[in-house]
Structure formats: C-alpha cells, structure tokens
Amino acid sequence: MAELASIIRPTKTPGRTSGRSTPGAAHLPPPLSTGLSDLLMLLQSPQKPGSGRARRRTVCRPRRSGPDGDFRPSSRRRTPRTRTSDTSRRRRTPAAPTRRTVCRRRPSSSSNTSSGTATSGESSEADWRDSSSASDDDRIPSSKTTTLKAR
C-alpha cells in the first residue's frame, strides 16, 4: 500500500507543473465513460426514425446487464440483419433462372424484328435496339415485370 501511495502522490503534485503525468492518470477515466455514452448515442440515433421499440431495448439492456450490456444488444441486433440478408438471398436465387430464360428470349425477338424490318429502315432498327437494350438493363432487377412483358 505504501508503494501505491508513493506512486499516486507524485502524479498529483508534479503533474500539475509538467502536465505529462496528469493526462495519463486524471484524464483516462472520463474519456472511457464519455466514449460509452457516445457509443450508446450512436447506436440509438439511427434507430430513432425506424421505431421506438428499438430505443427502449438499447436503453434497458445495459442497465440490467452492466458494462457487458453495451456489446450484447449489438450482437443481438446483427443476428436479425444476417437473417434478413439470408432470406433476401434465398428469394433472389429462384429469380435468377427466370432472368436467364428472359435473356434467352430477347435475342430471338430482336432477330425476328431485324429480319422483319430489314426492308423498312435500318436507322429505326438501330434506335429501337438501343432503347430496348437500355430499358431492359433498367428492368432486369425486377424479374416479375420482365417475365410478364416477355410473355
């Protein structure tokens, strides 16, 4: 205990003059507490427009579980996000073969239009191809509309 007192006392008195020992000893605890409060504010701020329920969870869990509660709700928040991404990936996989079949139908339709309108006008043909290719690229993400229009 005497060694601890001898270590603590010089940090108080000469630290005021030099300014080297007090920032290490006196200013370490407040940044930790302010950092935790900032983390809580950052975690709460993006959820405010979404729902008020998420706010209550973030406020109540750290009080119940203590300092470890700052990390537990974040891990619980991340798990539903991964689940939603997995479900969205599962939804995207059946849509991929429909896109492939639509893409296979498009060149056949363009070849039909080229053979049918070769005599009428080549410039209008090129314009139609450019506009259709651009609109098809825009419509690709919504597979339902492309399949309905192609059929």
UniProtKB/Swiss-Prot annotation:
Composition skew (Basic residues), residue ranges: 53-64
Protein name: Uncharacterized ORF3 protein
Biased composition (Low complexity): 33-45, 108-123
Region annotation (Disordered) ranges: 1-151
Biased composition (Basic and acidic residues): 126-141
Domain of life: Viruses
